Amino acid sequence: MAIRLILEAPDPRLRTISTPVEAVDDELRALIADMFETMYDAPGIGLAAIQVGVPKRVLVIDLQEEEDAEGKPIRHPRVFINPELFDPSEEQSVYNEGCLSVPEQYAEVERPAVIHARWLDEQGAKHEERLEGLLATCLQHEMDHLEGILFIDHLSRLKREMVMKKLEKARRARKAA
């Protein structure tokens, strides 16, 4: 396992449309292990393969919503290979979203509150599930990455430009430090 470099906006590779996974094999499982290690290290709750420079339709999510007796997050890692969404609800929900590729920037994004999804796991098993709440939002956010879309693309032009200016200012400050 290895921690990989997370691409940051405005890196043009983030705009790449990811291709379907042809085979669930040990090479893919190694990528998935690296993705989890990278996501936990960042820290984050979701990561798409394109964010580490691999244009494949793979993403990992772990909401880590529970804690153990010592206050450490309880991990519930989930792998989504070639995910598909269908039958989104008309009802919308709004979450204050962030992104490891747009570090330290957050904005409210409206998405369907309930979705249905189908995908393969890291063993190649098929799954289909109704998702809601933060998991539904996170899956939609990560699936946007597979299409070359960032959460800031859901914002008005003015808000998007403000986020990008803040991002560039923070990047310059990190380099100067």
UniProtKB/Swiss-Prot annotation:
Its EC number is 3.5.1.88. It comes from Rhizorhabdus wittichii (strain DSM 6014 / CCUG 31198 / JCM 15750 / NBRC 105917 / EY 4224 / RW1). Its cofactor is Fe(2+). It comes from the Bacteria. The keyword Nucleotidyltransferase does not apply. It is an enzyme of class 3 (hydrolase). The active site is at 142. Belongs to the polypeptide deformylase family. NCBIfam families: pept_deformyl, PRK00150.1-3. This is Peptide deformylase. Fe cation binds at residues 99, 141, 145. Keywords: Hydrolase, Iron, Metal-binding, Protein biosynthesis. InterPro entries: Peptide_deformylase, Peptide_deformylase_sf. Pfam families: Pep_deformylase. PANTHER family: PEPTIDE DEFORMYLASE. Binds 1 Fe(2+) ion. Removes the formyl group from the N-terminal Met of newly synthesized proteins. Requires at least a dipeptide for an efficient rate of reaction. N-terminal L-methionine is a prerequisite for activity but the enzyme has broad specificity at other positions. One of its GO terms (molecular function) is metal ion binding. One of its GO terms (biological process) is co-translational protein modification. It catalyses: N-terminal N-formyl-L-methionyl-[peptide] + H2O = N-terminal L-methionyl-[peptide] + formate.
